[in-house]
Amino acid sequence: MRLERLNYNKIKIFLTLDDLTDRGLTKEDLWKDSFKVHQLFKDMMNEANTELGFEANGPIAVEVYSLQAQGMVVIVTKNQDADSEDDEYDDDYIEMQVKLDESADIIYQFHSFEDIIQLSESLQRIGITGGTVYHYDGQYFLSLEDLGSHTAEGVVAVLAEYGNPTTLTIYRLQEYGKLIMDGNAVETIQTHFS
């Protein structure tokens, strides 16, 4: 579980599939109202309080984004007036609005373009030639949409050898990142860099 403070009232939590499995949960379980899900949320809020000083007092909004074969991104936003209204809420009660979204893209982050060149050889060997490469905040990102007949888990296993899953969405990369290669990145890299 990775935590990141986005601003005073908002945090982002990245849960890997291993984090969920360790707690006996699947991605599908998160959409259910169960004791395990409540315990996971309580653990996340306790860790956010310990690591970031983020106290979830009062009403909060929870946005859950499912990243295909990578895990989940949970964005928690507390009401800006929550600190002044602490008396109105019971300690064990948190009012939540939940927004759910699932991304079809698999996005991985790489420290150098050389990592993507090496990865592209492995991807082309298994028949994947598409993909889009972005540069953002000193890092490279590869987004894959069409996996052909391959399972997302199989492709993620190859991607994980060269890079790391990211919590950035495709929308952020499209808006703020620099587009390096569009559509057939793996094939283009193999043509020009092998």
Curated annotation (Swiss-Prot):
GO molecular function: protein-macromolecule adaptor activity
Domain of life: Bacteria
GO biological process: establishment of competence for transformation; negative regulation of establishment of competence for transformation; negative regulation of sporulation resulting in formation of a cellular spore; sporulation resulting in formation of a cellular spore
Coiled coil region boundaries: none
Keyword Repeat recorded: no
Swiss-Prot/TrEMBL keywords: Competence, Sporulation
InterPro entries reported for this sequence: MecA_C_sf, Neg-reg_MecA
Matching Pfam families: MecA
Family to which the UniProt record says this protein belongs: Belongs to the MecA family.
Biological function: Enables the recognition and targeting of unfolded and aggregated proteins to the ClpC protease or to other proteins involved in proteolysis. Also involved in Spx degradation by ClpC. Acts negatively in the development of competence by binding ComK and recruiting it to the ClpCP protease. When overexpressed, inhibits sporulation.
Free-text note on domains in this protein's UniProt record: The N-terminal domain has binding sites for ComK and probably for unfolded/aggregated proteins; the C-terminal domain interacts with ClpC.
Subunit structure: Homodimer.
NCBIfam families: PRK02899.1
Name of the featured protein: Adapter protein MecA 2
Organism of provenance: Bacillus subtilis (strain 168)
Name of the coding gene: mecB
